[in-house]
């Protein structure tokens, strides 16, 4: 399903889904968070068709999530790397929340070892809500409020 028409939606969730809702987009971002940056790395790790990967990378660049940086190995032609932008790095808590939900609600016997950890300690981290003063808010105490409510 194409979600291009959502880009003009007043809802920020719908606008975000116009980018992240495209098949492969979130997995490409996950791979970029793991340090992959070359077309061949994305293709190999994801098993995605070249034409689809090319389209998704272009969409993520156009959305400001990835940036293209050219590089050249000695004796080789110029190639492109795809690096996360600030907007791309801002998706870390979004992907962490998706992963946290998946571990909890879609657990499998041989589940993935992907997890988010604190860089300095290696300790697992969890996503949650906090008030402006830093105190925790239970998820069941949080409501989504529509405009004008």
Where are these regions (language model features)?
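N-terminal helix-turn-helix DNA-binding core of bacterial DNA-binding proteins
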Residues: 11-52
């Amino acid at each position: 399903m194409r979600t291009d028409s959502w880009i003009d939606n007043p809802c920020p969730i719908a606008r975000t889904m116009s980018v992240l809702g495209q098949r492969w987009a979130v997995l490409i971002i996950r791979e970029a968070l793991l340090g992959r940056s070359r077309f061949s790395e994305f293709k190999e790790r994801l098993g995605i068709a070249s034409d689809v990967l090319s389209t998704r990378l272009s969409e993520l660049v156009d959305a400001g999530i990835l940036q293209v940086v050219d590089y050249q190995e000695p004796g080789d032609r110029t190639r492109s790397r795809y690096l996360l932008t600030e907007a791309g790095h801002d998706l870390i808590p979004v992907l962490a929340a998706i992963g946290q939900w998946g571990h909890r609600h879609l657990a499998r016997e041989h589940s993935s070892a992907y997890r988010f950890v604190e860089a300095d300690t290696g300790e697992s981290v969890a996503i949650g809500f906090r008030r402006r003063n830093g105190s925790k808010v239970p998820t069941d105490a949080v409501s989504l409020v529509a405009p004008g409510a």
